[in-house]
């Protein structure tokens, strides 16, 4: 059972317990557990419902939501998007049309992409600062302070980037500065867990294998979040269209990489939660998680998503697993012009 059963956020009801069945009573949505009503919410206060429960919802509620223009989305308990219900006309049509218009306008795309990359650099610096704070004696002379300062110094450049190509150049320089010191943030069993640069296809060491797997899981969660709020995960602003690539999911995950994926991998290594034996060395030089290692990784990833924090913009206590959904909601509100701009997730 999830830590939080129900959470109303930005006029969206999140059902995060997997044994909750949703039904309709008059103009109210009822949350039922074992045929007992545990909560009720007036439908007129909601714009959307996102359920992470396999128990489902009544046809009457689905019909009422479709009639009232309330988005009803279903995800697995682990966050995989399954389906949405909508009526004959839906605000999602207007939302997606605006998304496509912005994606076709480089200047407007850059405006949103700037804030996402601002979040990525800010969170990268925060991750480095956390290592400095938690392990000060061991990492005092490793260049971490300088790297964090360099990332922070690039933040004004990000906001001033004139176009997407300039923004990508700044992001690339920041990624180099960040990954140059990542090895100094790995503090356990250095003979097995080291990082000498990013290698993707295939990953060539254990840390790159974990980073690639974490990024894949995070991209999946971001895509599910975007689809659940009615956005097209394949049409991005920073990452341009490419067949089969969920470009908007890649956009959204940029600001979340340092705090949700990279910090997770650092925790696995520094807390000795995975062993060197949990990886397989291929004849091609690729390094992959073994079946047992993948199971451990996934179990710990899902546990991490249940940890809670206070969202820095919303001021609400949320689980880490809800952060992509909160950001997807904020992005949708930005595209609808309910917000002056997109507020990135800024970790502290």
Where are the language model's segments positioned?
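Terminal-proximal segments
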Residues: 2-77, 87
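Active-site helix-to-loop segments that bind/position phosphate- or nucleotide-bearing substrates
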Residues: 2-25, 34, 40, 92-348
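A surface-exposed, charged beta-strand/loop segment in the N-terminal or early-internal portion
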Residues: 45, 53-126
């Amino acid at each position: 059972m999830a830590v939080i059963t129900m959470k109303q956020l930005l006029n969206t009801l999140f059902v995060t317990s997997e044994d909750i069945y949703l039904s309709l009573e008059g103009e109210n949505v009822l949350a039922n557990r074992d045929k007992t009503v545990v909560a009720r919410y007036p439908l007129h206060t909601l714009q959307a419902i996102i359920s992470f429960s396999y128990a489902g919802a009544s046809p009457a509620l689905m019909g009422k939501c479709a009639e009232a223009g309330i988005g009803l989305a279903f995800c697995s308990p682990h966050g995989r998007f399954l389906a949405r219900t909508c009526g004959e006309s839906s605000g999602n049509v207007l939302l997606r049309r605006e998304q496509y218009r912005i994606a076709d306008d480089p200047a407007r795309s850059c405006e949103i992409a700037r804030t996402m990359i601002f979040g990525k650099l800010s969170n990268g610096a925060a991750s480095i600062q956390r290592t400095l704070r938690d392990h000060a004696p061991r990492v005092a002379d490793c260049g971490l302070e300088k790297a964090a300062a360099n990332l922070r110094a690039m933040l004004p450049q990000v906001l001033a980037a004139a176009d997407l190509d300039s923004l990508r150049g700044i992001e690339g320089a920041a990624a180099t500065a960040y990954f140059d010191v990542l090895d100094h943030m790995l503090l356990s069993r250095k003979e097995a867990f080291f990082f000498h640069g990013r290698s993707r296809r295939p990953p060539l060491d254990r840390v790159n294998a974990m980073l690639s797997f974490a990024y894949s899981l995070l991209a999946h969660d971001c895509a599910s979040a975007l689809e659940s709020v009615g956005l097209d995960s394949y049409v991005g602003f920073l990452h341009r269209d490419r067949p089969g690539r969920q470009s908007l999911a890649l956009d959204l995950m940029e600001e979340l990489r340092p705090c949700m994926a990279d910090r997770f991998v650092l925790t696995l290594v520094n807390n000795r939660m995975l062993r060197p034996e949990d990886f397989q060395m291929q004849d091609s030089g690729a390094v992959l998680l073994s079946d047992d290692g993948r199971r451990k990784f996934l179990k710990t990833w899902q546990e991490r998503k249940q940890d809670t924090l206070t969202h820095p913009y919303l001021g609400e206590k949320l689980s880490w697993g809800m952060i992509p959904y909160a950001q997807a909601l904020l992005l949708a509100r930005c595209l609808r012009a309910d917000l002056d701009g997109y507020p990135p997730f800024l970790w502290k």
